[in-house]
Each structure stands twice: as structure tokens, then as C-alpha cells.
Amino acid sequence: SVFSNLIADMEIEFRLAQKDPNGNCTQGITRTNAPSASNSPSNRNAPKSVINWDPYSYLNIWVVNSISSGSGGNTLGFAQFPSTPQSASTYGVVIRADEVGMIGSASSADGRTLTHEVGHCFNLYHTFQGQCGTTCQFSGDLVCDTPPQFDDLNNSCNFSNSCSNDINGGTTSNPNPFTSDVPDQTENYMGYAIGCQALFTPGQKARVYAAFNSY
């Protein structure tokens, strides 16, 4: 693959919490029956108001039965960026139950939807953010080793090259490795081609760690 040298080990490990905010032992999973907490587009934070733990100590993930898209679309999950001017109590991921795990009613996504949404929590944009944009450090997903991408490619893993400005831009701290036009990076977790997602890049890793230091 043209991107085989652009695969980053994020060096982030997730564990279920062993103590709750009150210091009591926990398995890290709580179950709450809240049929009135409808997560409609106009009230995305409804499930979060039912229960949330200190976001400075825990990454909250609310697993729900369904998510209303309100537009006829198919919303699998959504997340809050660390820079979003909302209450810290709403920081985290809301995700459909059938997008978690690999048994029972689970979809064929193998957990990639949750990986994608946690990426947003850690300040990563979609690879098709801003379409083709201009220069990589000022437009698009603001990461120069993810080539610009015009749209979500209809969630397809098929070969595509939707932008021709891949070589534009780059800085010492956000280097652009491309010296010629390259295919769209459908393998990236921050795209929509769930069937072939397999990587984050060094530039995305640097952006995540910058967010850790900033927020």
C-alpha cells in the first residue's frame, strides 16, 4: 500500500474503570433504563444527562438502543470534540448498541465505529473535512499526511482519487510526505469506509497528543 509507511501506533490503552467516582468498586459498566431519554437531533445530550462520570477521570461512552438522525440518514454514533464549547459533563461518545462488540446483534463493523468516534473525542476530523481544501495545514482535517478527500466516497473501499492537491502545504511540525498525487486514504479510521478502516497516521497521532496537552 502507498500508505504502509504512514501507519502510527497511537500508544493509547483503554481499560474499564475499576472504581466509580465515589471510590466504590465497579466493572466499569453501568446499565440504566431511561426510555424518556430520547436522543433526537434537537436533544443529543439527553442520554448524557441520565448518568455521567467526571470526564477528567473517565472517558464516558453511552451505549444506546437507537439514535434518531432526523433526516432519514443512518447515525451510528456521535461524539463531542474537546474544543466544543459545551459542558464537560457531555464530553464523550454516544453509540448504538449494535455497533459495539462482535457477537450477538453486533454489526460487521468490528468496533471501528467506536474507534472513529473516539477519534473525534481526541480532536480528529473526518478525512473528507472541507473537501479538497487548499493547503493541508490550513484546511481539510488539518493533518498533512492524510491526503485531501472530496467526500465520504459513499462509504466505499473502492479505489478513488478525488483531489489533486495532495502535495500542497506542510510544515516542520505537520509534514506532508507526498511528492505526487496519491489515492484517497480509505483505510483511515476517520473516513466512512468502515469495511477497510485499519490505520491512523503519525500526523493524526501528533494532533491527538497536542489535544491531550491542550485540554
PLM regions and their residue ranges:
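Surface-exposed helix-capping loop/turn segments at secondary-structure junctions
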Residues: 1-3, 124-130, 215
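Active-site-proximal segments of metallohydrolase catalytic domains
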Residues: 2-94
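Residues that flank catalytic or metal-binding motifs in active/ligand-binding sites
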Residues: 10, 55-57, 89-91, 109, ...
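Structural recognition of the beta-strand scaffold that forms the well-ordered cores
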Residues: 13-16, 58-63, 91-97, 113, ...
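Short loop/turn segments at secondary-structure transitions that flank enzyme active sites
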Residues: 20-22, 67-69, 101, 128, ...
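Solvent-exposed, flexible loop/coil residues
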Residues: 33, 82-85, 147, 193-194, ...
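The catalytic-center signature of Zn2+-dependent metalloproteases
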Residues: 100-199
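Pan-zinc metallopeptidase signature
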Residues: 193-215
